[in-house]
From Swiss-Prot:
Zn(2+) 2 binds at C359, C362, C395, C398. Phosphorylated. Phosphorylation is induced by NGF through the MAPK/ERK pathway and modulates interaction with RAB11A. It comes from Rattus norvegicus (Rat). Zn(2+) 1 binds at C343, C346, C367, C370. This is Protrudin. The lineage of its organism: Eukaryota, Metazoa, Chordata, Craniata, Vertebrata. Residues 1-92 are annotated as: Sufficient for homooligomerization. Residues 86-90 are lumenal. Residues 1-25, 259-299 are annotated as: Disordered.
């Protein structure tokens, strides 16, 4: 400890020498520049203003390629193809000079004719999103600045996400992660090289232009819409022709039927009422069964009132139960499960003589022979007192099931 104290108290560690040594060893501290996020937003807006003409041009090209106005897109495609195929070398140089001179002239006229607005007018109108000078002059409030920063961050995040997705897609194509897409990409490149070598430049440009306009999905969408419109315009005429043809066929069929019917004798009366009376005069078994079924299925209200008077001791619940059982039976008869026109038992085809009869239990359609078994309604779960004596028609299988 003493030796160290002596070393520090020696001439090498004198106070006059120490500041010089420290000044030589430590560099001067530099002032760190602070990061201003709002200045970044202003720079981004200036960049948007600079690139606004290019953005408008891109929007116009996309508008034409998407066939939003089919006539303009078609005229543009045809006009560009004609220019590519007909212009010679001198004409191309003239077109290039025109493309250079027109933006220069427009920029000069815009700068000359622009009105100089005072700062107070800029502050009053909040004209900060039009020109870069306005962005430098106008002072935004804190909420407006925060909103601008948030909007910038959202756009930046979306741009970075799209850029990352594009890079990943290119990486997959270059590394053959999807062989089909990679083969298509390299095949297209080789085809373009061969096309540039074999065909003139004007033909290459015409083919490229036609591919851009006619090879996208929007073109096929427009074509399908126009095709559907033409079909709708032509369909009324076709419908009129079809209606006329069907009317002629109906008229011819009626004439044939009238010719084939025998001539009535003077003693016969062929009015609808007399025909029905003649048909109902001698009903066979099937008609008798059908008539019995209809009579039993639709009882008259007078009989219901009489039964209610006779059975005065019935409660309201029993009356409701009887009505519910009748309604379910009618629904079963009205909506049979077999609607194919054949008997579910013997497969006989229903006709005027072979009438359809629905089983009151399963609801299937049978002929009068297969559905000729009568069982009381109480066997199917009906609780009304009338169900003990009322019977309904069921099929053979349901009769066996209900009889057990």
């Amino acid at each position: 400890m003493q030796s160290s104290d002596r070393d520090l108290s020696g001439p090498e560690a004198s106070p006059s020498v120490m500041p010089e040594v420290l000044s030589e060893c430590s560099p001067a501290p530099t002032k760190s520049t602070a990061f201003d996020l709002f200045n970044l937003v202003l720079s981004y807006k200036r960049l948007e203003i600079y690139l606004e003409p290019l953005k408008d041009a891109g929007d116009g090209v996309r508008y034409l390629l998407r066939w939003q106005m089919p006539l303009c897109s078609l005229l543009t495609c045809l006009g560009l193809n004609i220019l590519f195929l007909t212009l010679n070398e001198g004409a191309w140089y003239s077109v290039g000079a025109l493309i250079i001179s027109v933006p220069a002239l427009l920029g000069y006229l815009q700068e000359v004719c622009r009105a100089q607005l005072p700062e107070s007018e800029l502050m009053r109108r909040k004209y900060h999103s039009v020109r870069q000078e306005d962005l430098q002059r106008v002072r935004l409030s804190r909420p407006e600045a925060v909103a601008e920063v948030k909007s910038f961050l959202i756009r930046l995040e979306a741009f970075l996400a799209r850029l990352c997705y594009t890079c990943e897609s290119a990486y997959r194509v270059l590394h053959w992660e999807n062989p089909v897409v990679s083969s298509q990409f390299y095949g297209a490149l080789l085809g373009m090289v061969c096309m540039l070598y074999l065909l003139p430049l004007c033909w290459v440009l015409a083919l490229l232009n036609s591919t851009l306009f006619l090879g996208n999905g929007e073109f096929f969408r427009v074509v399908s819409e126009y095709r559907a419109c033409l079909q709708r315009r032509m369909s009324p005429k076709q419908e009129e022709c079809v209606c006329e043809g069907s009317a002629l066929q109906d008229a011819g069929g009626r004439a044939v039927v009238l010719d084939s019917t025998p001539a009535p004798t003077p003693t016969e009366d062929l009015t609808p009422g007399s025909v029905e009376e003649a048909e109902e005069a001698e009903p066979d078994e099937e008609f008798k069964d059908a008539i019995e079924e209809d009579d039993e299925g639709t009882p008259c209200p007078a009989e219901d009132e009489l039964t209610m008077q006779d059975n005065g001791f019935l409660s309201k619940n029993e009356v409701l139960r009887s009505k519910v059982s009748k309604l379910t039976e009618r629904l079963r008869k009205r909506y049979p499960t077999n609607n194919f026109g054949n008997c579910a038992g013997c497969a006989a085809t229903f006709s005027v003589l072979k009438k359809r009869r629905s089983c009151s239990n399963c609801g299937n359609s049978f002929c009068s022979r297969c559905c000729s078994f009568k069982v009381p309604k109480s066997s199917m779960g009906a609780t009304a007192p009338e169900a003990q004596r009322e019977t309904v028609f069921v099929c053979a299988s349901c009769n066996q099931t209900l009889s057990k």
